[in-house]
Amino acid sequence: MEIKRLPALSDNYIFLLYDADTQTAAVVDPAEPTPVLECLNKLGAQLVAIFNTHHHYDHVGANNQLQQYFPNLCIYGGSEDRGRIPGQQVFLKEGDRVEFGQRVGEVLFVPGHTRAHIAYYFPPKLSQETGELFCGDTLFGGGCGRLFEGTPTQMVNSLTKLRNLPDNTRVWCAHEYTLKNLQFALTVDPDNLVLKNRYHQVKEFRHQGQATVPSILGEEKLTNPFLRWDNSAIQLTIGMTDPARVFGKLRGMKDTF
C-alpha cells in the first residue's frame, strides 16, 4: 500500500492510498476533489473508498463530487456521525475492520475533537512495514485538535488509545500545524532537549517548504505535550496532576496561544 500526501485548502492534507496490484485507490478525508482526481489520473487508478474520520467540511467536502465520478465507491465514517457525513454508506464503531488492498485497518473510536471522531490504524502486515495511523484532527504533529464537541476526559482516553500504539507507527494527521504546535510545546516543556531538537528541525523543514507529516509516534510521545499529561515536568508547570485537568489546562492555554 502506497500513501500519497495531497495538500489541500490552506493547510489540509488528503491521503490517497494506492494498491498497485489492483490499480485501486482510497482516500482519507478528502477536503476538495481536484487534488484527488489529478492524482488518480496520474496513477491510472480507480477510487473505491473514502475513509472519513469526522464530519467537518474540510474533511468531507469532496465526498459528493467524488461519488459522482466514481458511483461504485464506498464511503465510510463513524456510526455516531450518521446524517453528518455526505454520502456515508458504512457506519463504523470501535473494533470494526476496513480492508484496502492487502491491508486491514482497525477502527478506533476517539471522541474529543468531535463526539463521533474515529481513527484508522493499519498495523504492519510484513516485518519491514510500519503501522499507519490516520487520525484526522485528534492528534497533530506536536499537538491535538480543539475540543469542539468533547470533554478533556474523552480526549485523554482517546489519546491514550493512540499513545498505546507502537512507537514506529507513522502518524498521518490532517493539517500542517506542527511548527506552531511545537512553539507552544516549548512554553510548557522548555527543558525538553528532544523537543528543542525537533522544533529546530521542523522550523528548517518549513523554511524549505517541506511537509512535517507524517510524524513518528515515538517522537510524538517524547515531544507532544498533549501525550504527556502524566509527565512530571509538565505537571509541575501546570500545577496539577489529574490527567483530565492537566490536559484541559494545556488545551485552554493552546487555544489562546
UniProtKB/Swiss-Prot annotation:
Cofactor-binding details, from the entry: Binds 2 Zn(2+) ions per subunit.
Q: So what does this thing catalyse?
A: an S-(2-hydroxyacyl)glutathione + H2O = a 2-hydroxy carboxylate + glutathione + H(+)
Q: Where does Zn(2+) 2 bind?
A: D58, H59, D137, H175
Q: Which cofactor does it need?
A: Zn(2+)
* Molecular-function annotations in GO: hydroxyacylglutathione hydrolase activity; metal ion binding
Question: Its pathway?
Answer: Secondary metabolite metabolism; methylglyoxal degradation; (R)-lactate from methylglyoxal: step 2/2
Tell me if Metal-binding is a UniProt keyword of this record. Answer: yes
Q: What class of enzyme is it?
A: hydrolase
Return the Pfam families for the record: HAGH_C, Lactamase_B
EC number annotated for this UniProt entry: 3.1.2.6
One Gene Ontology term of the biological-process aspect is: methylglyoxal catabolic process to D-lactate via S-lactoyl-glutathione
Name the keywords, alphabetized.
Hydrolase, Metal-binding, Zinc
Keyword Cell membrane, does the record have it?
A: no
Sites where the protein binds Zn(2+) 1: H54, H56, H113, D137
Q: Could you tell me what this protein does?
A: Thiolesterase that catalyzes the hydrolysis of S-D-lactoyl-glutathione to form glutathione and D-lactic acid.
Family matches, as PANTHER family: HYDROXYACYLGLUTATHIONE HYDROLASE, HYDROXYACYLGLUTATHIONE HYDROLASE GLOB
Quaternary structure, per UniProt, is: Monomer.
Similarity comment: family membership: Belongs to the metallo-beta-lactamase superfamily. Glyoxalase II family.
* Protein name per UniProt: Hydroxyacylglutathione hydrolase
Q: Which organism is it from?
A: Rippkaea orientalis (strain PCC 8801 / RF-1)
Organism classification: Bacteria, Bacillati, Cyanobacteriota, Cyanophyceae, Oscillatoriophycideae
